[in-house]
Amino acid sequence: MSVPLAPKKSCFGQLRDHREGAKNNNESILRTGDTNANQIMLEVSSSCDEAKSRDLDDELGNSNLSRPQYHSHFQKEPLHLQGFGKGSQAGSTSQRESQASLTVHRQLSEEHAVKRGALQAPQCVQGPSLSSWRNAVGQASPEASAKKDAEIPRHIPKDKLAKTLDNEELKRASSCSAAAGSVPPTDLQPVQLDTLGPQDHVPARGEGPQRTPASHSPGKGFSPGEGTSEGNSVYLPKPSTSEAKGSSPSDTKMEGPHGLDVYNERITHAELTPSSASASKENPGLRHPEVCLGQGTGKSKVELKSVQPRNEEGLTSAQAQGPGCHEERSMSPVERQELLEKAYREATSQGNSSHRQLGVRRGSSLEEMTGVSAGVEGSQQATPTLSAAPAGEAGTRLTGKMSAGVGRMARETASGQTAPDVGQAAPVRRDPTESVPSEVSGEERRLGSGNSGSTKLLASGPSAGGSRTDTSGLLSPRGSNLEARKGKEMVAENRNLLENAAQTDNTPAGVDSAFSTPAPLLHPETTVNSSHHPTPPGSSSQELGVFSGDTGSPSVASPPTDGGQVLNTSPKVPDRTTCSSGIPKPPTHPKDTPSSQEAREKLETEKMEERAEAKPILMPKPKHVRPKIITYIRRNPQALSQGDASLVPVGLPYAPPTCGMPLPQEEKAASRDLQPSANMYEKLKPDLQKPRVFPSGLMVSGIKPPAHHFSQMSEKFLQEVADHPGKEEFCSPPYTHYEVPPTFYRSAMLLKPQLGLGAMSRLPSTKSRILIASQRSSASAIHPPGSLTTAASFYGSDPSDLKKASNSNAAKASLPKSGLRPPGYSRLPAAKLAAFGFVRSSSISAVPSSQSLDSVQPEQSRPVTRSTFGNEEQAPLKQALPSKDTPKGAGRAAPASSSNATTPRRSLLPAPKSTSTPAGAKKELQKDPEAKKPAVSSPKRTASAATKPHSPGYPKQRTSAPRNEFPPKPDLQAREAERQLAQRLRDRCEWQARQLGLARRELKKAIQGFDALAVSTKHFFGKSERALAKEKELSIELANIRDEVAFNTAKCEKLQKEKETLERRFEEELRRLGWQQQAEVQELQERLQQQFQAESARLQAEHQDQLLRMRCQHQEQVEDITASHEAALLEMENNHTVAITILQDDHDHKVQELMSTHEFEKKELEENFEKLRLTLQDQVDTLTFQSQSLRDRARRFEEALRKTTEEQLEIALAPYQHLEEDMQSLKQVLEMKNQQIHLQEKKIIELEKLVEKNIILEERIQVLQQQNEDLKARIDQNTVVTRQLSEENANLQEYVEKETQEKKRLSRTNEELLWKLQTGDPTSPIKLSPTSPVYRGSSSGPSSPARVSTTPR
């Protein structure tokens, strides 16, 4: 088995970035359609990067949802996709690419389903499914996927795409129609399916069902001509979601073979229509009615905008054109193949993440794919589902005609045709002509899912073609009716093969399952389905491999109206389409594929519940009382494991619809699925053992743990019950977003004693319940399944408490609320029940049956009371929600929520449905007897009912599911009769369930015990043999070791003795030597002491002699040095005196010169001064003379004037004689002033002269000062020189002193050395005489430096 490939973090990061870039650039994904309806994410997977981005998104989106079980299962289940195993690697790349594209589209659908989670259908089946495929493919053939990635051209010019599309449009038209059928509108994201088109050459059919994988991406999958299996391309106006729904019903009416294609087209159209509409708006040129399969009564004019396979680099324009397929047209077949390879790789890479992500996105995407692959009905229903509200109706209609058998046929055809056409038919072509009636298709689904698809896929599992076929089968459930029938015939064999090979092919099947499962995600209400949808890679693989067979189960998961094809995948109607058809066929997955089976079962259950919600109209029973027919079909624990119970919290409103009861067509597959695998049982055991897992209702009702599968007979009975449209419709859906977890009301009911019918009044009104349920459902939708599980546990009291309560009035009260269900039972969410393999029929009877299961165990007598309460309660509830006018959101929720509201305690029972549609409940009651009858009701009717979930009529569960009208409310008596009948049926079902559960439990325990015994026996037997052989060897070795030990011991003792002897000898010798050494040391010490004393005396004498000699020599040296020093001093003094005299002479001479110069200059200045003085004197004289003359003139003039004035005065002033005196005084004053002026002028002149003299003197003073400064500078220089000389003299003196000291030191050193030499060993050559050069040098050295130094100075 191939090793599971976990998505790399780097890949995740790249994909995330790529995805974000794609979102920002609209390169990878084009959203079209109403945001409220189902936004169709057109994801252009022209490049592997884009696919990876989707994968990453899917992985990211579903990473939380993805279960380790899914991964482990999917991966453990070697992705023996027929083309993904080693065989797949060997298989043609085109098939792989087809599968990759399928997976890409599925994953895209899943992504969209997840994204739409609450309200939007999966935009692209491609998302998680592709990642699931990647897991499958990557695991089985990681190399192949890598190669494909390399092969797929990321950049495909639009021109090339357009060119290649022209040739391939026809081929892909069929493949696209198949893809359209398999891929709900959510598959709009083109995964370069166009490229898959060339790769996925229709092996036998030009229709292109084989292209379904390639065509899966709505945009790419549907190229003009591809859209129709016939190659007819029709440009369809963007149908509104409601239009898409409407068209899907008509498409459902298409011919059987084309019905699938039409179904695909419908789904694609419905889903793609929003996207294609927007896409066509964006890219009218791109718009290709690729999926216009006019084969049926109405060719679904799917305006499939083939999404340009955008090369991340080259096709940026694809952002707007992403929906269009023109790129594909321009692509050459080779390029398309490369793109398909890229898509395949993306799918394989995304498969790993997608399978993990199937929990949510794949859930939806898988359901979508399942619905698509499951059958045209399912897909059509899914398509209506994708459409906003109309999708529900259209989905119902589509499901009515599109039979699950179509999906199965597609699967069978996919498996059969793909097996033959491994290379080309990797995507199994869906021949719309091959589509069979819903019954046949349901059977085909069972066969295809269980056998033909799975068997063929398994058979071809080794080959890539086989795996692709698987994918094709999943994608294009178009198996021919004959193939479907053959698949039925081969069901038994195929089941065995599927169970065996499905285990290996779990991953492929899981991928298909993932594709089929996406539908539930399409519905926000079906969010439960989304949570379930995460089909573990195993389940996806199984669904891929078993898509032919498993599509049925996926379709069951997304319960198709007929064959469990849950075409709820239609992303548009998120809530109801999930429950598109009657009881989904439990996938026939081997035990190894429990995750995928669980996921599919959950998806089927959810879809069936949704279908039940949508199909309440189909329910003939007018009363709300739900017959207590056991609707729990024990699904394979594997499916549960795939679905992972954790994904479906106990109280999770998202719990997959309990309508797990396969239609009679699905009985075989269901029985196969119902057969629990020991592995699954083990996996589920903990959950089963968990008290919260089984509400008291289950405990009391005696419902067996999911591990206990109902016998095939019981399953058939359940299926029959489910087959009844109403029953199928009322597969108790998981709590829709609008529903309140049944445990909520149930707990309330339990808390409040139920007093007769009056207890109903205590229950919240249907509307209030719906509101509460919607609030809770929204909360649950917001919260992940885990939280929902927690909520469920909160809502439901401990199973023991619930048992007690259910046994008590609470159980009875719960019956009215839930119809006939015991409170404890409803406590268990539908998802949990589905996870445990208990699939509730999708009919009202299924809901009551689930209730009856709960109630039957507590007490069969209670059912009567319950039925009474249920009738009363349902009547008010019906009144509360009697009309279709209830808001579509509420309507959708209302079916589920009202069912849950009616049975708030039973999350799995759509009590509100009966409440909302009392007529539907009555019809259900009426059908309860029919429920006893084999569910022979046409799958079409079931499908139509399933499609109805969105309509408010769904809660009514009328038999006329397509109609939204509510049947007239039957009177209370009729309802009572129906309730009683339902109670009886429930009692019977519960008894059978208990019997079957006990038998299965015992059988399983016996099998498990036997297996354990065999394993343990084998283990211990082998262990004992090995132990004996090893024991012998060890005994021999032990004997040898003992011998060696004895020998070594003897040797060691001998050595020890020798050692002791040697030690004694050594000690004795040591003592002897010690004594000898001490004696020698003493003798040596004495001798050395004597020698030392003699030598010391001799050395002292010699030292004295040498000291005397050294003193004499030193004295002589000192005298010589002193004499030489004195002589040097005298010489230096003489030289200094001479230098001083010379300097003084020079100084005197210079001073004299300066004096003479100064005198000369002084004389010159005096002469100049004199000259100037004389000149100035002359000027003064001149000026004085002039002033005298002027004064004279002034006097004369004054005299004349005076005379004149006197005369005049005398004449004129005769009377004024005194004026003369004044005049005289004034004259005197003037004279005085004149004198002062003259004096001042003289002073001024003198001062001027003094100033001139001062100036001259100042100049002379400056000159003298300069001279004085020069002389001072010279004196300073002389003094500096004198100081330097004196310093030098002092230095010389110091040097002389130092030399003297040095000489003294040297003399002392010499003396010491001589003394040492003399006192030393006479033979020593170092000894020197006083006359040696050392002495001479020492004696002469000191004086010479002084002389040398002084001499230069």
From Swiss-Prot:
Q: Where in the cell is it found?
A: Cytoplasm, Cytoskeleton
Specify residue ranges for compositional bias: Polar residues: 89-101, 239-251, 347-356, 566-581, 853-871
Ranges of compositional bias, category Basic and acidic residues: 145-172, 325-345, 483-492, 598-614, 921-933
Query: Residue ranges under compositional bias (Low complexity)?
Result: 530-541, 805-818, 893-904, 1332-1353
Q: What is its main location?
A: cytoplasm
Does this UniProt record's set of keywords contain DNA repair? no
Please list the coiled coil stretches. Answer: 976-1319
Asked whether the UniProt record includes Ligase among its keywords, one would answer no
Q: Which domain of life does this protein belong to?
A: Eukaryota
Its assembly, as annotated, is: Homodimer. Interacts with KIF2C and MAPRE1; the interaction is direct and probably targets MTUS2 and KIF2C to microtubules.
Region ranges (Disordered): 1-30, 81-101, 125-259, 274-615, 799-823, 847-972, 1315-1353
Q: Where is this region: Mediates interaction with MAPRE1?
A: 626-964
Residues with the modification Phosphoserine, per the entry, are S364, S365
Known tissue expression: Expressed in heart from early embryonic development onwards. Later during embryonic development, expressed in brain and nervous system, in limb buds and in the epithelium lining the bronchia of the lung. Detected in adult brain, heart and eye, but not detected in other adult tissues examined.
Organism source for this protein?
Answer: Mus musculus
Keywords, sorted A to Z: Coiled coil, Cytoplasm, Cytoskeleton, Microtubule, Phosphoprotein
> Would you tell me the protein name for this molecule?
Microtubule-associated tumor suppressor candidate 2 homolog
